[in-house]
Swiss-Prot record:
This is Gamma-aminobutyric acid-binding protein. Keywords: Periplasm, Signal, Transport. One of its GO terms (cellular component) is outer membrane-bounded periplasmic space. Residues 1-28 form the signal peptide. It comes from Pseudomonas aeruginosa (strain ATCC 15692 / DSM 22644 / CIP 104116 / JCM 14847 / LMG 12228 / 1C / PRS 101 / PAO1). One of its GO terms (biological process) is thiamine transport. The keyword Ribosomal protein does not apply. Binds specifically gamma-aminobutyric acid (GABA) with nanomolar affinity. Does not bind structurally related compounds such as 4-aminovaleric acid, spermidine, histamine and butyric acid. Transmembrane segments: none annotated. It holds the Pfam family SBP_bac_8. It is found in: Periplasm. GO terms for molecular function: thiamine binding; thiamine pyrophosphate binding. It comes from the Bacteria.
């Protein structure tokens, strides 16, 4: 009798443990995390590398959304205390500005791995870098008699007739205008920090203005190039690579490109901060970053990832040594300090 009761107790104990484990797993699966990124080919790669694997690992459901980087939407949520986004993908100037304005949670780098295993600049007070991208010059190789070599060629409508695509904003657009005007990449922000440099950039844009078609979403440049609406465009390298995979005959000019990390940030006041940090840690592993870079050629930030990637993939990354020749890192601090005034001036100029 005692043996029988002992057996029942043992079975009951095991069933209880199983029930607790099942309940914990069910609770994890019932948790959802809203992750907002820039959409398009990048979001598709994130789905394969991060969102779906995170769900399969039991981390919780990922509700994926997209935006065009409008910090006003984040600010509105934080200001009224109704935060519906948990994790957002942001560019470095917006990360620094948003951190200063209290829009993002402070993050502890120790939660995401050994900092020595990541490229410099991965960890910020309010963000963790997820990949490195480049703003490049792209063109349709079937529509030009010869290949353009520089932003000076981009401005040369006599030898390269046709419309040009440029991002509708001061950031990146003022930089390429100065590069087209002969400013060296290493002197770019030193010149742009002066009133004379700013006037020089806008004067250069005046020359091209009748031939410019402005884009606001990253998907537009490859679409316009493929349709023949423009013959050259500033574009995100990953968007051009996605079009190339589909058989569109687009080419990239790497010298004069502008590269920058993209970051994950956690929106201030989210009730899911712990889950958000868990997701970011998951997305910061070499294996998950490998899958991402195989889907879209953006540079990984974990140093251990490169050894896992085929050579052909490594050569297409913005961080490949050959692609960094003549390239310039975006100066995020410059845009934090001068962004508002330059965007206002740009908007007034574009409206004329």
């Amino acid at each position: 009798m005692f043996k029988s009761l002992h057996q029942y107790a043992h079975v009951f104990s095991r069933l209880s443990l199983f029930g607790l484990a099942f309940a914990a797993a069910a609770q994890a699966q019932s948790q959802s995390l809203t992750v907002i990124s820039f959409g398009g080919a990048t979001k598709a790669a994130q789905e394969q590398a991060y969102f779906k694997p995170f769900e399969r690992s039991g981390g919780g459901q990922v509700v994926a959304g997209e935006y065009n980087g409008e910090m006003a939407k984040v600010k509105a949520m934080v200001d009224v205390g109704k935060v519906s986004w948990d994790v957002v993908e942001v560019e470095s100037p917006e990360l620094l500005r948003g951190c200063d304005e209290g829009l993002f949670e402070r993050l502890d780098p120790a939660r995401f791995g050994d900092p020595a295993q990541f490229v410099p600049g991965t960890f910020s007070e309010c963000g963790v870098a997820t990949y490195v991208w480049s703003m490049v010059m792209a063109y349709d190789s079937t529509k030009l008699a010869r290949a353009p070599q520089s932003w000076a060629d981009f401005w040369n409508v006599r030898e390269f007739p046709g419309k040009r695509g440029l991002r509708k904003g001061a950031k990146y657009t003022l930089e390429v205008a100065l590069l087209a005007d002969g400013v060296k990449a290493e002197d770019l922000y030193k010149v742009l920090a002066t009133p004379e440099g700013v006037s020089r950039a806008f004067a250069k844009l005046d020359q091209l203005k009748p031939n410019i078609q402005w884009w606001e979403a990253g998907a537009q440049p490859p679409q316009w190039l493929a349709a023949g609406d423009v013959v050259m465009s500033a574009a995100y390298n990953g968007r051009i690579a996605a079009a190339q995979k589909e058989g569109v005959k687009l080419a990239i000019v790497w010298p004069g490109s502008l590269y920058d990390p993209e970051y994950w940030a956690v929106v201030k006041g989210t009730p899911n901060k712990a889950l958000a940090e868990k997701f970011i840690a998951f997305a910061s592993q070499p294996q998950t970053q490998k899958v991402f870079s195989e889907q879209i050629p953006y540079g990984p930030v974990h140093k251990g990832t490169l050894a896992l990637l085929p050579k052909t993939v490594q050569e297409a990354l913005p961080t490949a040594p050959a692609n960094l020749e003549g390239a310039r890192a975006v100066d995020a601090e410059f845009w934090v300090d001068h962004g508002e005034e330059l965007e206002q001036r740009f908007n007034a100029w574009a409206a004329r």
